[in-house]
Design a protein with these regions (language model features):
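Short, highly charged low-complexity linear segments
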Residues: 72, 96-106, 137, 141-145
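Residue-level signature of alpha-solenoid helical repeat scaffolds
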Residues: 37-44, 59, 78-82, 95, ...
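Small-side-chain structural scaffolding
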Residues: 38-41, 65, 100-101, 112, ...
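Long internal repeat-built scaffold domains in very large eukaryotic proteins
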Residues: 1-27, 110-276
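Alpha-solenoid helical repeat scaffolds
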Residues: 1-87
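Juxtamembrane/interface motifs at transmembrane-helix termini
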Residues: 93-98, 129-133
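C-terminal, active-site-flanking charged/polar segments
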Residues: 82-92, 98-124
């Protein structure tokens, strides 16, 4: 597929998205099927053109996991799981398993946790294979922890994200807390992978905190007004990580890591917030 073909396909997809949300001549079920068709088409396009998929289309695709029709959610998440397992889809799409979680007792919690463990295992396999071939190359994007910057940004831009300046009730932040907790517990908790390889827990903890610190030293490249929300989510993530790894709290985490340029822009040091 050349660039012209990609943009033609993207135009058709945008048209489908629009009519699936705003058409008044179609039933709700028809619109849901159109949204699913568009999302599945995006997943197929990303196999070769992931770097060309706009951020807003990426988010629209992920939010099929929040669709009002349970069957659409199930079909979409099944396809995401399949493509990631086949290594035909970037692990960042695992965010789709997370943004629909708003409580520990959500029926799909254990299923999504299992899916995330599989995604983490796939990332670890890719990382180890690449390290054995090119040990001097920065392979952070192959780390399962690299899902974090995408999840933080997705949560900050999700309609369910509360305004951090207006809400004082901790329950309002459940849509933020539980997705973060599920991902971090998969990476750092007892049900995760850190005990399978010596030193993995420490490495994962350091990488996790380095990612959060790097985000706190950045601004939102899509909407600068969301920067404060990004930083607040990172503060929450750091607290969760430290609670999951109390024996690692004193580990140094000064490493700066590169972040997805589509989502984050660097800021001057004097603009950085104080670390947690």
């Amino acid at each position: 597929m050349n660039d012209l073909s990609f943009y033609f396909s993207a135009y058709i997809l945008c048209y489908i998205w629009v009519i699936s949300y705003y058409s008044i001549t179609r039933s709700a079920s028809d619109k849901a099927h159109l949204r699913l068709a568009a999302a599945k088409a995006v997943l197929r396009l990303t196999r070769q053109w992931d770097h060309k998929v706009p951020v807003d289309v990426f988010y629209l695709t992920l939010r099929i996991s929040q669709d009002d029709f349970p069957q659409m959610r199930k079909l979409f998440l099944s396809k995401v799981h399949q493509y990631i397992k086949e290594r035909a889809l970037d692990a960042k799409y695992a965010c789709a398993f997370l943004i629909g979680i708003d409580d520990y007792h959500t029926p799909q919690y254990e299923e999504f946790q299992h899916n995330l463990i599989e995604v983490s295992q796939i990332c670890q396999q890719v990382k180890m294979r690449q390290l054995s071939v090119q040990a001097d190359v920065n392979l952070l994007t192959a780390y399962p922890e690299y899902i974090i910057p995408y999840l933080v940004h997705v949560l900050a831009h999700d309609p369910s994200c509360p305004n951090i300046d207006k809400y004082e009730d901790v329950k309002a932040f459940a849509p933020i807390y539980w997705p973060l907790h599920l991902l971090l517990s998969t990476l750092l908790g007892e049900e995760g992978l850190q005990y399978s390889v010596p030193g993995m827990k420490k490495e994962s903890f350091m990488t996790t905190l380095s990612i959060f610190r790097s985000i706190k030293c950045s601004k939102d490249a899509v909407d600068a007004n969301k920067t404060k929300t990004l930083h607040a989510i990172c503060d929450l993530g750091i607290l969760i990580a430290k609670r999951l790894c109390p024996d690692q709290i004193n580990v140094s985490e000064n490493q700066t890591v590169p972040l997805p340029a589509q989502l984050y822009a660097t800021v001057q040091n004097d603009q950085n917030e104080n670390p947690v």
